[in-house]
């Protein structure tokens, strides 16, 4: 469930941070979450973001703004700008998760 969503989120992280940094980030985030960070992001983005803030402090917001911008620029997200993306992460809950799931999708073919 959410395989395409998780693929695009992982592409964003790898593109922005590089594979080695993503591996380190995943280690620390997944140690706190007890499971795959991309699965948690899909199911409960607020919980994911809370853990990311615990680890990175104010850098978590900067990173997630970059992720949102990357998703938009590469055609993987529609209808959410970085400000709204952060607002949904901070809000959390099922409604926020569903809004993100609808916004993140394969890019349109031209």
Language model segments and positions:
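Short, hydrophobic/amphipathic alpha-helical patches that form generic packing surfaces
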Residues: 7-14, 50-51, 65-73
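Amphipathic alpha-helical binding modules
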Residues: 74-110
């Amino acid at each position: 469930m959410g395989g395409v969503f998780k693929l695009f989120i992982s592409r964003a992280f790898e593109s922005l941070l590089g594979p080695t940094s993503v591996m380190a980030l995943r280690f620390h985030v997944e140690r706190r979450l007890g499971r795959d960070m991309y699965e948690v992001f899909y199911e409960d983005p607020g919980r994911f973001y809370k853990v990311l803030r615990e680890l990175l402090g104010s850098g978590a917001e900067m990173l997630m703004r970059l992720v949102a911008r990357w998703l938009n620029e590469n055609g993987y997200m529609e209808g959410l700008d970085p400000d709204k993306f952060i607002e949904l992460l901070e809000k959390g809950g099922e409604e926020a998760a569903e809004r993100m799931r609808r916004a993140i999708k394969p890019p349109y073919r031209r």
